[in-house]
Regions:
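N-terminal signal-anchor transmembrane segment
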Residues: 1-53, 71-80, 131-138, 365
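A juxtamembrane structural motif centered on a specific transmembrane helix
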Residues: 1-15, 54-56, 171, 349-354, ...
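Hydrophobic transmembrane alpha-helices and their immediate junctions
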Residues: 6, 10, 314-316, 321-363, ...
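Hydrophobic alpha-helical segments of polytopic membrane proteins
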Residues: 15, 61-65, 166-236, 349, ...
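Transmembrane alpha-helices of multi-pass inner-membrane enzymes
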Residues: 42-45, 340, 358-367, 371-404
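Transmembrane alpha-helical segments and their membrane-water interfaces
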Residues: 48-55, 69-127, 347, 365
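Alpha-helical transmembrane segments of multi-pass inner-membrane proteins
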Residues: 113-142, 151-206
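Long extracytoplasmic/lumenal interhelical loops at the membrane interface
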Residues: 147-148, 258-329
Length: 404
């Protein structure tokens, strides 16, 4: 087979870079026909074909060991509990496709090329969202008036663009920072507000800057109190969540429990029950099955949620990645989470690790809010973080994005 001409190589690399970064913002671009036909999957299919034809598709030992663990752990727990294997296979297949794709694309470029382009796309996404927000027309399929630009919901928008917001802030590109930061405020997303707070708190958590951190915390509390006092949605969610924590023991929800609180606490209750009975977890992809077949009958769900057909809301992703890891991997999931948090904290001790810090904020928010294993952006961020942080031979250039 003839090798592609130099111009073709350049154009192909440019296409792979731009299409792959663009793909992480395409969660809402889908068409429902029996299953969700997503633009993200189409991009992966086309680009995988190009990679196989013109590049070298590889997997390293870490990937093979990781997939082997997921498969063996899943097989053992599924057989022991009696869970149908389709839950296991669908998750492993999705993770394998998304992770191997980004592994083989990202290794073709430097971190600078990848992350700077991601930040530019995030900025464009924010700018596109302002006309729709201020003039009152939706750019998306949802009917939520809050800021979400082209993404599925305000919370998902906040999680995806927050790394870019932090990146611009640390690079002192304040105009770009302010544009994205303003969009995060307008999203009125609790997870977005938490992420904004983390941007200013996490860089100062080392012992040498404890005094500064203590000074910032009251400022953050004042902002939270202001938002709490003036935003009825945030106030309702916070009050209901605080009052409903006792449901983790009983599983009996008050008839007035709001949807967001129910989504979080019902999945946390299921994860707790599953962890008690299966300390090593029930296997990847099993939370949904355990929710419906084992533990949902123990709960008292508000009747209005049955009317709205939301009685099992977020049961597929457990509402948060941490809750899902507890449910499906038990002690192993807890240890993996703490290990990841340690890695994230360490990045903030090195001023040069701006990219790693940016992604660290994303991971923390992901642990708290979204439990899906392969949304478009997840392995894009995870692979940059892991291989960059461990100094593995992955990118063409191991230098950090620390220069101005």
């Amino acid at each position: 087979m003839k090798k592609p001409k130099p111009n073709l190589k350049i154009n192909l690399n440019k296409y792979l870079l731009h299409s792959s970064v663009f793909a992480i913002f395409t969660e809402a671009l889908k068409y429902r026909f029996i299953i969700d036909l997503k633009l993200f999957y189409l991009i992966l299919f086309i680009n995988f074909f190009l990679l196989f034809k013109y590049k070298k598709v590889t997997l390293n030992r870490f990937f093979l060991s990781f997939f082997a663990f997921l498969f063996i752990h899943g097989c053992l727990t599924y057989l022991w509990i009696g869970i149908p294997p389709n839950f296991l296979l669908s998750q492993i297949l999705g993770i394998a496709l998304a992770s191997s794709y980004f592994y083989n694309v990202l290794k073709l470029f430097t971190k600078e090329e990848v992350f700077i382009l991601y930040a530019k796309y995030a900025l464009i996404l924010a700018i596109i969202g302002f006309p729709g927000y201020f003039f009152g027309f939706n750019l998306n399929v949802n009917y939520d008036p809050r800021f979400s630009s082209l993404l599925t919901e305000p919370a998902h928008y906040a999680i995806v663009v927050l790394p870019a917001c932090y990146f611009y802030f640390k690079r002192k590109q304040y105009v770009s920072f302010f544009i994205i930061f303003l969009s995060l405020i307008l999203s009125e997303s609790s997870i977005g507000y938490i992420g904004c707070a983390l941007m200013f708190i996490l860089p100062y958590i080392n012992l040498q800057r404890v005094k500064y951190a203590l000074g910032v915390i009251p400022f953050v509390l004042v902002i939270f109190y202001f938002v709490y006092s003036n935003n009825e949605k945030v106030k309702t969610r916070f009050d209901d969540t605080f009052e409903s924590l006792k449901v983790l023991e009983t599983g009996k929800f008050d008839v007035r429990t709001n949807i967001s609180t129910y989504a979080l606490l019902s999945n946390l209750y299921i994860a707790k029950e599953n962890f008690i009975e299966h300390p090593l977890g029930s296997g990847i992809g099993s939370h949904y099955y355990m929710y419906h077949n084992n533990y949902k009958k123990k709960m008292r769900t508000p009747k209005y949620l049955y009317t709205l057909e939301l009685d099992d809301i977020n049961s597929k992703d457990a509402t948060s990645l941490f809750i899902r890891l507890i449910s499906e991997f038990g002690i192993i999931g807890i240890l993996a989470t703490f290990y990841m948090i340690i890695l994230i904290v360490r990045t903030f001790k090195d001023k040069s690790q701006i990219v790693e810090q940016s992604i660290g904020i994303y991971i923390l928010l992901k642990l708290f809010r979204d439990g899906h294993y392969f949304p478009p952006e997840l392995f894009f961020f995870l692979l940059i973080f892991y291989f960059s942080y461990t100094k593995s031979f992955f990118f063409k250039n191991e230098g950090n994005l620390s220069h101005n």
